[in-house]
Structure formats: structure tokens, C-alpha cells
Amino acid sequence: TYDMDSMIEIKGNLVQMNFRNPHSSVMIMAPEEDGNIRRWGVEWGGASLLMRQGLTRTSFRPGDEVVITGQPSREKTDYRMRMESILRPADNFGWGFDEDQTFD
């Protein structure tokens, strides 16, 4: 489960995107403050909902540098989060910045 009272931001390279129902997910490699690289699992909305919101399975690809915000896992040693937004700074393409872009 996630700490819905907290919000974190991670920046890194997308290594995998699973565009499916009931939940999509992305995996990113992101540097920690100590310089170590961590693999984060980020839960997202289902593919059918995301497609209605304008995304496709190729909207984000492995190798994309992304910034993701969301709620972290309640377990601090578990590198997972629930996505609130994702941004690709290279072209400012993102999701989660419009009020209709949510999976609740």
C-alpha cells in the first residue's frame, strides 16, 4: 500500500513500460542522494483508462528521461510508488497535469 499523505518526486531513465489492465506500470532507474542507482516500480492506471486520456503504449519508451511524482510505499525500503504525474522534460510531454488525467 501507499502513503497517501506523502508525495515524492523521482527523476531517472525509464527502463520498462507495462501498458495493461487493470494497472499499468513503469520501471525507472533513478539516482539516490548517495549516488546509488535504484530501480523504482511505479503503479499507474489501466491501459483502457489511459488510452481514453490520450496515451498509447508508445507514449513513453525505454530510454526516456522522466520525472515522476506520486505517493511512496508505506514500507521505506520498498522502492515503489503510486503515480500522480509523469513528465518527459525533453519535449515537456506529460500526464497527470490536467484534472481529467487521473486513475482514481
Annotate each language-model stretch with its function.
Residues G35-A47:
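Short, basic/aromatic beta-hairpin or loop at an interaction surface
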Residues S73-Q101:
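OB-fold/S1-family single-stranded nucleic acid-binding modules
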Residues R20-P31:
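Short aromatic-glycine-enriched beta-strand elements
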Residues T1-I8:
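Short boundary/loop segments of OB/S1/cold-shock single-stranded nucleic-acid-binding domains
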Residues G12-L14:
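Conserved hydrophobic positions within beta-strands
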Residues I8-I10, V66:
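Hydrophobic core residues within well-ordered beta-strands of beta-rich domains
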Residues M51-I68:
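Short nucleic-acid-contacting surface segments enriched for D/E, G, S/T with interspersed K/R
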Residues E9, N36-R39, G94:
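Short, mixed charged/polar active-site loops
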